[in-house]
Design a protein with these regions (language model features):
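C-terminal leucine-rich, beta-strand-based interaction scaffolds used for sensing/assembly
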Residues: 93, 97-181
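Short, conserved catalytic or adaptor-binding loops enriched in Gly and charged residues
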Residues: 10-16
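Conserved nucleotide-binding/hydrolysis micro-motifs of P-loop NTPases
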Residues: 1-2, 25-27, 71, 174
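Sensor-1/coupling segment of RecA-like P-loop NTPase cores
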Residues: 1-10
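Conserved AAA+ ATPase "SRH/arginine-finger" region at the nucleotide-binding site
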Residues: 18-29
Length: 181
């Protein structure tokens, strides 16, 4: 929505600013940063714990910070993978009511499609026969409407590149929760 203020021809700030794309933080840089933050407070965190954090949060800063903060609160001296798993599970349990509320706003087909995307992580061919058959999602024409509806509701995120579009569940924690459904 904010981007449209600057890129849509009928918007008030059309072409009044430069648009920059910000990539995710490099994984190695991020891992070192996490380790340094723990060390600064006289705590340790194992390499496999950091790897899991970055994988599970898809190196998205908001989710990475939230999980790291929770792990930091839980541990006294050293954070191991088991501590991260407990923290991740706790976060998902805390958000369950919110996630279930979203369920009530969707049709059964929208819900099932969202689960399918979450289980895949990233979908590059959202109407392909293989994807639709794997998750019993129906015909490509009806799935296109589902996809557009979930994009409008901002439950799915579309990422465009020169190679094409890819889709994932917008909220990483919601995606991880849906994987368990």
């Amino acid at each position: 929505m904010i981007a449209e203020m600057f890129t849509a021809e009928n918007a008030p700030f059309y072409e009044s600013a430069s648009v920059y794309s910000i990539d995710k933080i490099d994984r190695e840089v991020y891992a070192k940063f996490i380790e340094q933050q723990f060390k600064a407070q006289k705590k340790e965190i194992t390499a496999d714990a950091i790897d899991f954090i970055l994988d599970w949060t898809r190196t998205h800063t908001y989710y990475t910070q939230m999980l790291c903060n929770r792990v930091f609160q839980f541990v006294k001296k050293e954070a191991a993978l088991v501590d991260v798993l407990v923290a991740a599970d706790t976060i998902l349990k805390e958000h369950t009511d919110t996630f279930l509320e979203r369920r009530n706003l969707l049709t059964a087909k929208q819900w099932n499609y969202l689960i399918a995307v979450a289980k895949e992580g990233v979908v590059t061919e959202p109407t392909s026969a293989a994807f639709l058959q794997k998750y019993h999602l129906g015909a490509p024409s009806s799935v296109s409407r589902l996809l557009n509806s979930l994009l409008e509701k901002e439950l799915l995120l579309e990422t465009k590149t020169l190679e094409g579009s890819s889709y994932c569940v917008y909220n990483v924690f919601f995606s991880r929760w849906l994987e368990r459904v």
